[in-house]
C-alpha cells in the first residue's frame, strides 16, 4: 500500500465522518426545535388543550379513543391525497360529511365501515 493512498483514505474517512456527524446534529436540532409549547406543558394542561382541538359541534360522547380513530382516518386521508382541505373537510360537522365517507371507503376495508359510522354517530349526537 502506498503512503499516499493511506493519507487519502484517512482524509476521505474524516470527511465522511464529519458529514455524518453534521447530519446527526442538524437532525437532532431540528427535531428538538419542533416540540410545541403544548408538548412542554404540564400533563393536566395537555388534556384540556387537546380537547379544544376537536370540533365543538361534536355534542355526543367525548371519547378520546373514538375521536382519535376518526381524526387518524382524516389525517391518513390527507397524507394520501395531499390536498389542503381534505383533513378539514373530513372533520367538518363532527365527521358527518361526504369527505369523511369518501376517505372511509378509500382507506378502510368494508368490514370496518359500519364501526366507523357508529363512532361518528356516537361522538356527534
From Swiss-Prot:
Leader peptide range in chain numbering: 1-34
Cystine bridges: 58-94, 74-90, 77-103
Tissue expression profile of the protein: Produced by the medulla terminalis X-organ in the eyestalks and transported to the sinus gland where they are stored and released.
Keyword set, alphabetical order: Amidation, Carbohydrate metabolism, Cleavage on pair of basic residues, Disulfide bond, Glucose metabolism, Hormone, Neuropeptide, Secreted, Signal
GO molecular function: neuropeptide hormone activity
Record localization: Secreted
Pfam families: Crust_neurohorm (PF01147)
Superkingdom, taxonomy of origin: Eukaryota
Residue(s) carrying Valine amide: 123
Main location, first listed in the record: secreted
Cellular component terms per the entry's GO annotation: extracellular region
Record GO biological process: circadian rhythm; glucose metabolic process; neuropeptide signaling pathway
Database matches in PROSITE patterns: CHH_MIH_GIH (PS01250)
Function as written in the Swiss-Prot or TrEMBL entry: Hormone found in the sinus gland of isopods and decapods which controls the blood sugar level. Has a secretagogue action over the amylase released from the midgut gland. May act as a stress hormone and may be involved in the control of molting and reproduction.
Family listed: Belongs to the arthropod CHH/MIH/GIH/VIH hormone family.
Protein name as catalogued: Crustacean hyperglycemic hormones 5
Native source organism of the sequence: Penaeus japonicus (Kuruma prawn)
Amino acid at each position: 500500500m502506498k503512503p499516499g493512498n493511506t493519507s487519502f483514505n484517512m482524509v476521505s474517512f474524516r470527511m465522511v465522518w464529519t458529514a455524518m456527524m453534521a447530519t446527526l446534529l442538524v437532525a437532532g436540532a431540528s427535531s428538538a426545535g419542533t416540540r410545541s409549547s403544548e408538548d412542554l406543558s404540564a400533563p393536566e394542561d395537555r388534556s384540556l388543550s387537546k380537547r379544544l382541538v376537536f370540533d365543538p359541534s361534536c355534542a355526543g360522547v367525548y371519547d378520546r379513543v373514538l375521536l382519535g380513530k376518526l381524526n387518524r382516518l382524516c389525517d391518513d386521508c390527507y397524507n394520501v391525497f395531499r390536498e389542503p382541505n381534505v383533513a378539514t373537510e373530513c372533520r367538518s360537522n363532527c365527521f358527518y360529511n361526504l369527505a369523511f365517507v369518501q376517505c372511509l371507503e378509500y382507506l378502510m376495508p368494508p368490514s370496518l365501515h359500519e364501526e366507523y359510522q357508529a363512532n361518528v354517530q356516537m361522538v356527534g349526537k
